[in-house]
Amino acid sequence: MMENKMFCYQCQETVGNQGCSQVGVCGKTPETAGLQDLLIDVTKGLAEVINEVRCKGKEINNVYDDQVSENLFITITNANFDDQMIIEAVRKTLTLKKELLLQLDDQAVLSNRALWMEMDIEAIEKRMQMVGVLETADEDIRSLKQLITYGLKGMAAYNKHAHALGFRKDEIDRFIETTLVKIETSTMSLNDYVALTMETGKYGVQVMELLDQANTSTYGNPEITEVNIGVRNNPGILVSGHDLKDLEMLLEQTKDTGIDVYTHSEM
């Protein structure tokens, strides 16, 4: 049996419907998978410090909430395989965490994950080998933790798009952050994880409502429209995803340039 170079079973196309362990079917390399696992780990650390600062009755600036959603969004399926950008996100997260740690006199209650602050590439590469999906031994607990995490990633994507349009709901940010901490709590039972999975679904509906409000308030209600689905000889840009703010900015920049903009999926 070959040794695992990585482990990812985030999407429905994994090798043998069990998980990619040598390289991703999507093209994700073991290095990228490891960096994404590390980014999730340091995001959990930031979330823990955010929660502790809140418990002290102190306000949290939205920049910290936004970084949590940004990090989760980076790691969703096929969103970002840029290793250098992921390393920069890790370092930015650690820098933000360091700022918040200054607000805590008693750091003894924090986990090793919350206190880890190494930024040099050697330490980052070493930490990558210590974190990831398989660090949870119990298969049932592991599966529920990942199911919740994938739910949070989807929430983070919608959350980020809503933020881009100036809409936010503090309860959603708080749920994401407290849940990132809860799933690593050793006292959680299997039933606790099942209950938290259901609660994640409830907040998933709330963030969908927030994004719908943001999109319709900004651009109006969608309506059936006839469009040309052919191609022309003009230079073109193909847009994927569902970030309407990005699309708006692109359309403004390409106005009267002769460049055709093509969309698919939710666009």
Predicted segment positions?
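Metallocofactor- and cofactor-centric catalytic cores in central/energy metabolism, strongly enriched
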Residues: 2-267
